[in-house]
Amino acid sequence: RSEYSARLVFLSYNWIGGIQGAAAATVLAQGVAALGIIIYTYRRRPELRWHHEDMCFDRTCLKEIASFSTLTCIQQSVMNLGILMVQGLVNSFGTAVMAAFAAAVKIDSFAYMPVQEFGNAFSTFIAQNFGAGRYDRIHRGVRSAFVTAVVFSLLVSVLVFVFAEPLMLIFVRPDETEIIAVGMAYLRIEGAFYCGIGILFLLYGYYRAIRMPGMSVVLTVLSLGTRVVLSYWLASMPEVGVTGIWWSIPIGWLIADVVGIWCYRYVKGVRGS
């Protein structure tokens, strides 16, 4: 994304050092990305420009937007709360595990970012056809999107599994062998199940598009709830340890996938999509 590119530029120049520099780079990158989007939209999408006659209050639209945004806020809050709880557990295993987790999560997020954005585009496609009543196109689009997401996720899984060590070396010095080993274990466990999160992103997008955002919240709670509960349970076993945290993440994805697909079959029958 443009935000991440700008952040890398600001960080590479290192105008402000340390944590303050990273924080400043993040804020500046977000501002640059927002400004770029505004300029692009104004120049290339005249239909989205504001005009005086558009400045009116619509109570129905406000109510609809508020209902959707509230559920989205709940979804994001649950997601971040779960991540914080897992991060707290990871921190209890010491600095080496903390450093490995921090580096591996960045690689992990970058690896599945394309399928996440694909899920957003998929949501737009479904919403347009749902509004137009084109359920036949929705059905074909769902099949095509799932195949595409699975194939892409499998490809990325292979790349991350094979190149786990070189990827860790982007963030870690070669002599920090413990951090590299822990990070590689994380990447290879998560990477083997990228299909799970790829499908989950499609399910999030699908339920938002057909005006069932509450289902996206349910899937998020299932995924993150499973991750948190299993993380604390498995990590408490001496024979499992920190590896249990890594395994809890894809297990959460897969459980949410099963529930989401089961509900999709029901919704498909009811709505004809």
Predicted features, each with a name:
Residues 2, 35, 77-81, 110, ...:
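Hydrophobic/aromatic residues within the transmembrane alpha-helices of Major Facilitator Superfamily
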Residues 3-4, 170, 226-227:
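Alpha-helical transmembrane segments of compact multi-pass small-molecule transporters, enriched
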Residues 5-13, 38, 84, 88, ...:
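Alpha-helical transmembrane segments of multipass membrane proteins
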Residues 7-17, 77-106, 110, 128, ...:
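Helix-terminus/linker motif at the lipid-water interface of multi-pass membrane proteins
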Residues 18-19, 96-97, 213-215, 241-242:
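Membrane-helix interface segments
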Residues 29-33, 37, 41, 59-121:
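Transmembrane helical elements of multi-pass membrane transporters/channels
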Residues 100-164, 197-219:
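Small-residue-rich hydrophobic transmembrane alpha-helices
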